[in-house]
Amino acid sequence: MKILAVVLISVIVLNTANGENYYPQKYTNDYYGCQKQTDAFCDKVCKLHLADSGFCDQSWGLAKACKCVNVSYDNSFFFNALESQCPLLNKSAA
């Protein structure tokens, strides 16, 4: 039982530390579409969201959206990513 608990905690810690892949959202809570864009566009968008990289993904049928690699869930949202980059925007610091 102790081994199972240690394994579970290890998995949670590794997922939290490494981040995951998420679709970043604009300030309007819409996804960044890439129907007419390239992977380079998505890579720039994702780096603004503090991800390692990004690419154009077509997981939703005909719709294409940018997907970020190794980004935290919080930073997948536009204003959260801004607050992470600029401490002056952080409400709790005021």
Curated annotation (Swiss-Prot):
GO MF annotation, one: toxin activity
A Pfam family it matches: Toxin_3
Alphabetic keyword roster: Disulfide bond, G-protein coupled receptor impairing toxin, Ion channel impairing toxin, Neurotoxin, Potassium channel impairing toxin, Secreted, Signal, Toxin, Voltage-gated potassium channel impairing toxin, Voltage-gated sodium channel impairing toxin
GO terms under cellular component: extracellular region
Localization of this protein: Secreted
Record-annotated disulphide pairs: 34-56, 42-66, 46-68
Tissues expressing this chain: Expressed by the venom gland.
Primary residence: secreted
LCN-type CS-alpha/beta domain residues: 20-87
Superkingdom to which the source organism belongs: Eukaryota
Residues in the signal sequence: 1-19
UniProt keyword Disulfide bond, yes or no: yes
InterPro entries: LCN-type_CS_alpha_beta_dom, Scorpion_toxin-like_sf, Scorpion_toxinL/defensin
Subunit structure, interactors included: Homodimer; disulfide-linked or monomer (edited version) or heterodimer of an alpha chain (AC D9U299 or AC D9U2A4) and this beta chain (non-edited version).
Function: The homodimer inhibits HMG-CoA reductase (HMGCR) (32% of inhibition produced by 0.6 uM), a glycoprotein involved in the control of cholesterol biosynthesis. The inhibitory effects of bumarsin are seen at much lower concentrations (0.6 uM) than that for statins such as atorvastatin (5 mM) and simvastatin (10 uM). In addition to inhibition of HMG-CoA reductase, this protein lowers cholesterol levels by inducing steroid hormone synthesis via StAR, and by increasing reverse cholesterol transport mediated by the induction of ABCA1 and APOA1.
Family: Belongs to the long (3 C-C) scorpion toxin superfamily.
Domain free text: Has the structural arrangement of an alpha-helix connected to antiparallel beta-sheets by disulfide bonds (CS-alpha/beta).
Name listed for the protein in its UniProt record: Lipolysis-activating peptide 1-beta chain
Organism of provenance: Lychas mucronatus
